Amino acid sequence: MSEKEKKMLMQLQEMNQADGYLEAHRTVKEPMELLGGPISFTIQQNSGGVFVALPDNRELDSDVFGTPKMPLAFTGTPGITGVPVPFRNVEDGQFTTLKRKTPFGDKNTTMANGNLMLKGTDVTATDAANTEDQVKMKASWEDKEGNTYAVRCCEMMVSSGPEFPTFGGVVTNHILHGFTGIGTPLMPSEYTYAAFWGMGAVLKNGEVVDKPRVVHGMLTEYVRGENYKLVSDSEVTPTRRHFHLMVAPFMPVKGEHKFQHKNVSTGFQLPNGMELPFWHVMFENLDISSERGE
């Protein structure tokens, strides 16, 4: 990274719009509880495959990213909370695609034997120093060579977000991503029935290959189209749901309220010989249950 790029990165991180809100919450030791009481939920997949995202150049939705004359969603760590304007391709006065490949795009592959067991409880309403939110999750899938990949979470919840709110680590019945400023705008704005952020581990064939990692999962309305294209906001399907599992190539900077790039050790080799630097896995054959109360 050049000195000019480093300076731009620092400026964009300092401009993060959620900083004031997060500062007010991150030292709270006795946060308020969810209105109406806790929500407990279970999300399972016991058969079928999964869709695994591959690095791709995301098409940029003008509703989320604006135009070259009036850009939107550019502050914060690139890829986490914004996309710098210099990282965007322009044609005929409009943003077209991201210049860099990320976990968010249309390219994907399928893998077999997708299994997911997730039990979560949303108790704490807001970001805070302490949380009663909980998630226990194990997800796994298998490549064509018979290797099994897995992600486990959560040894601890991310009770307060470095750059955007995490609502104690678990949030239910909210809108995330896209225009919201909560999570990367490279995903469409999507109604989210349940989501979590926590610290977990990445495994291959039963052996831990990367730990600790920030793990994000969410049950959302459907944001894929024909040929599994990642759609724009106007193309979201509100009457279908799927579960996204994300281990992003970023980690929080210790002692600071920002992220830095750090590839995930997945153990999965891409056709070009490089290791896939993230996991972005979609589960679609779901059994879902929920109730008020712990």
Language model segments and positions:
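Tryptophan-anchored aromatic micro-motifs
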Residues: 10-107, 196, 200
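Polybasic, proline/glycine-rich intrinsically disordered low-complexity segments
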Residues: 57-58, 101, 108-110, 119-129, ...
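Predominantly extracellular/secreted and cell-surface proteins with exposed
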Residues: 88-213
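Low-complexity, polar-biased intrinsically disordered regions enriched in Pro/Ser/Thr/Gly
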Residues: 61-103, 163-187, 224-236, 257-268
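Sec-dependent, cleavable N-terminal signal peptides
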Residues: 1-4
